[in-house]
Amino acid sequence: MEEAYRQARKRGEQGRRRAISQSEHPYLTDLDSLVAQLPLGQRENVGLRDIPLEMVVGTVTKGRQSAFSCNFMPLLPFNTEFARKWSNLYDIQVTEGYRDPVIVTEFMHRFYVQEGNKRVSVLKFLDAPTVSAKVTRLYPGTWDSLESRLYGEFCAFWRVCPLYEIEFSREGSYETLAKMLGQNLIEKWPQKKVDYLRHTFLLFKRAYLRAGGDHLDITPADAMLVYLNVYNQDRLLDTPTDIVVNRLCKIWRELVIAGKNDEDKVDLVEAPSVDEEESPAKSTSGVLNFFMGKTVYSAANPLRIAFIHEFPCATSSWDSLHDQGRQYLDEHFGGIVRTEAFEDCHDPDVFYAAVETAVKHGDKVIFSTSHRLMEYTLRAAVEYPQVRFLNCSIGLPHQSVRSYFGKMYEAKFLLGALAASMADNHRIGYHASVFASGALSEINTFAIGASLLDPRAQIILTWGDVPARGLAEAMCREGVSVMTGADMSKSLEDPTAYGLHRLIDGKVAGIAMPVWNWGRYYELIVRSLLHGTWDETSDDSRVRAVNYWYGMSSGVIDIRYAPGLPYQTRKLVQLLRNGIVEGSINPFGGELHSQDGVVQIEGFPPLPSTQIVEMDWLADNVVGTIPQTDDEPKVRAL
């Protein structure tokens, strides 16, 4: 049809000019040129498939390259044989449809046409979603680039769930999606599950594009993972499109963050502002007068804060410590701040009920005190944007929820030095219960601290949930006389293995332990709210997550000695502690060695904080390994 070809050619010219103006290739990409200098792997006959037309991006050979614009629209004049054939194919398609499939080569999750370029062009002009094709898959020759690794993950996904439409830009996403649906990447999925995912994704994609998702730097599949992480209890197929669009608008900043590079996702706030450091308790005029004129809150109009704990405070030392911090706020701020606590909220329904109650009570800030509550906290934050939510974790890139945690590695550095000063045979035990963000930095600073006092020190590393007495016996068999285990216990007289302790004749004798001062931490955060500096922490023009990461210099972390520790030893540790607080000592500055070689050479500045949080190596004097994530999934936050 003459008019159809003219319209298609017009779109082709527009696409060609747009590409030239943006310094892009104006014609179809040809696969032969694309792979000419690349190492290639084997070819695999995939067979007859319906493939997404939006993923058909080029031709196999150069022969037809200049006949089409980069958007697959025709460019040749109307009075040509090419134009007549294109028009005939158009007439066939609109009257009866094609019967024969095109022939394509798949390379890196894109398709290049061997036979049927004009048919593909006609279908794209008609906005058809798919085309029937005989597919040959061409594998890359190496798998060391991000793109090839992502393609390898896609191929593993495709073998169990043959959907081309699902494309991720982050490693590990296919496995995450499979787990969300109760599947894996090893066993073939039931056809009902494949069909469900296809229909769900297409519904979500329409809503995502309607909400303006094509302006974001993520794929629709990336966005669907973010959506499901917040609204994972809802079946998308049963949700009206208008509601999905509305929800996408609510989590828009989460979607923006998902498109950023890892180093651009999180702002680590490592020290409080000057205003936050000022202590109202030291004011001679009293707490109320100290804040007079500095805050909109008063005893008559207090800042109301809720704390949501995972377990009962009577049975969980972690939750009990946080609740002591909550009680400190009530006492410290003299009526300007009023708090309430909700315990045993590990069940999602109980958690959401607690949030609803807190909002009804007028609470403007909600702390959830366990990283395992982050999923629930994120969804609640999206539903109640007028409330400020914080979760006790580190390294999680959520703009709707701020995270807070402490630089425990500083305390572990001191404990490592202390351990080396008291070990009899250069062998020191270290037990970590969970593989978490920050765990490796704590192990490594412990090892570095030990090596400062004893260059021959070896850190015997074990992982997992092991009974304290069984762990002590196992360490004794390894010749370990000094070790560090769990960080918390109700008292130093507790006979279980906690903190740094000696192993003597099968018994435990405490040496020192790390200490959390959650009252101080909550005081610093709340003071930013009272002073009105909360919003100054992050620049609204840059959508980033905010993670508070305070350390010894802020008074939120310290160590406590057992009674009877020699004063010479305490003096040594105090010197190192002063260096940490003053900033003259950084365990991760200068020369660093891992089990695999040199991390950085002498004279180098300290590692950036983001590298410390996401550390993925062990110091050279650590005897042990990092758990395999397939066997023991890494917890993303402490």
Q: Residue locations for each model-derived region?
A:
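An alpha-beta-alpha
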Residues: 326, 414-457, 542-563
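Flexible loop/hinge segments that line or gate small-molecule binding clefts
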Residues: 382-405
